[in-house]
């Protein structure tokens, strides 16, 4: 993204002080691309010349989380520490870390603390769990702004995103009023005074991670973004689950939508030659443009990876019981017990209706269109 001229009185607030009740762990400290979600967002923000950056956090922020910033001072109210950074940048960057004065008030608590100490004409306010927000949409938010409105709210597929939005500094008084009334709804401060812009074409920018499932799905998207070709594995713990039939149906669906699909099959057989009605033959007849059959061997996982990444396709589907690559969809037979949590499986594919889990998404084995849509999400298609 190109660098922009500095816009006076446009500040950035990163909300990193929430309870993360659905995630069950601090979202600002989740591992992300060799750092954390907080560090990732802060580093990404350097592309845009904000007047000041404020992090709302109700914990101690370690120096490694804000690389190259030098501590300048602590404001005597005990809620704020200020930093400055100038190494490797065209202009100095001013950073403040503030804690809430009003506890247990959600995002409004962080917004109040930042706006009270650092008045600014406009604020870009972002939740910390937006790993794909790269600040390229900031000009669009600014262009949509109008003086009589208090906020510019992105809308994705009909859903408002008030924690990835532009606000006027004057909403501070509305925040104080809402807090005094114990009304912690963010919508309260922009209701009837906002411009809504359709950002559906840029939906990935606004993808957030509120749950363990959403976090794994975001990691899958990021992993595939950095591969030569995106990969999704379909696995099963036992034979006879129908995963080959499922894969051929998905290949047929995706091929019908115009995607070039590759297929890699992990097998324990040593013979890998072409054979009528073999799994690779069925995949080819379903529409796969490339197939590979990988037998057992000491470096089988590497062989599967090499075969997948050598294919000139839009997506590779891997069928394997144990050697698939992340992300994985696990096919469960109706009689199977509860699936154990693991870091590589993002969804269960089953006919069962009692598989509600905080660790996995659940897809019905007969809903091929939904399966294909979900696979496209993981593959960034």
Indicate residue ranges for each PLM-predicted region.
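N-terminal phosphate/diphosphate-binding loop that engages ATP/GTP or pyrophosphate donors
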Residues: 249-299
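Extreme N-terminal, non-catalytic leader segments
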Residues: 203, 214-233
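Phosphate/Mg2+-binding loops and adjacent switch elements
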Residues: 318-381
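Short, charged/polar "capping" segments at the starts of alpha-helices
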Residues: 60-69, 271-274, 336-340, 353-358
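Glycine-rich phosphate-binding P-loop
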Residues: 232-255
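Nucleotide and nucleotide-moiety/phosphate-recognizing core
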Residues: 3-161, 166-170, 176-183, 192-205, ...
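A charged, well-structured terminal subsegment
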Residues: 177-213, 368-381
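Glycine-rich phosphate-binding loop used to anchor ATP phosphates in small-molecule kinases
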Residues: 296-334
């Amino acid at each position: 993204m190109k660098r922009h001229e500095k816009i006076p009185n446009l500040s950035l607030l990163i909300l990193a002080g929430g309870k993360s009740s659905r995630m069950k762990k601090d979202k600002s400290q989740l591992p992300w691309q060799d750092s954390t979600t907080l560090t990732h967002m802060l580093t990404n923000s350097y592309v845009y010349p904000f007047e000041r950056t404020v992090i709302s956090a109700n914990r101690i922020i370690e120096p490694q989380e804000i690389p190259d910033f030098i501590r300048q001072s602590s404001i005597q109210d005990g809620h704020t520490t200020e930093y400055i950074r100038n190494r490797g940048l065209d202009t100095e960057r001013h950073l403040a870390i503030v804690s809430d004065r009003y506890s247990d008030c959600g995002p409004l608590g962080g917004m109040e603390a930042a706006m009270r100490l650092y008045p600014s004409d406009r604020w870009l306010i972002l939740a910390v769990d937006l790993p794909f927000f790269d600040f390229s949409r900031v000009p669009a938010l600014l262009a949509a702004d109008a003086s009589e409105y208090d906020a510019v709210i992105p809308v994705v597929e009909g859903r408002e995103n008030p924690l990835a939005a532009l606000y006027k500094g004057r909403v501070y008084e509305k925040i104080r009023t809402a807090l005094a009334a114990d009304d912690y709804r963010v919508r309260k401060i922009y209701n009837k005074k906002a411009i809504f812009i359709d950002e559906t074409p840029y939906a990935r920018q606004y993808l957030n991670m509120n749950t363990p499932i959403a976090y794994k799905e975001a990691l899958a998207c990021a992993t595939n973004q950095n591969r030569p070709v995106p990969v999704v594995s379909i696995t099963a713990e036992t034979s006879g689950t129908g995963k080959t039939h499922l894969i051929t149906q998905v290949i047929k669906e995706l091929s019908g939508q115009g995607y070039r699909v590759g297929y890699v099959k992990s097998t324990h057989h040593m013979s890998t030659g072409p054979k009528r009605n073999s799994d690779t033959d069925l995949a080819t007849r379903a529409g796969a443009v490339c197939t590979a059959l990988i037998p057992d061997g000491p470096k089988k996982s590497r062989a599967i990876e090499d075969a997948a990444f050598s294919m000139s396709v839009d997506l590779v589907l891997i069928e394997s019981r144990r050697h698939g690559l992340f992300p994985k969809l696990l096919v469960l037979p109706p009689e199977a017990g509860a699936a154990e949590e693991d870091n590589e499986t993002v969804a269960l594919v089953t006919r069962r209706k009692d598989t509600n889990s905080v660790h996995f998404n659940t897809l019905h084995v007969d809903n091929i269109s939904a399966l294909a849509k979900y696979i496209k999400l993981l593959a960034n298609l």
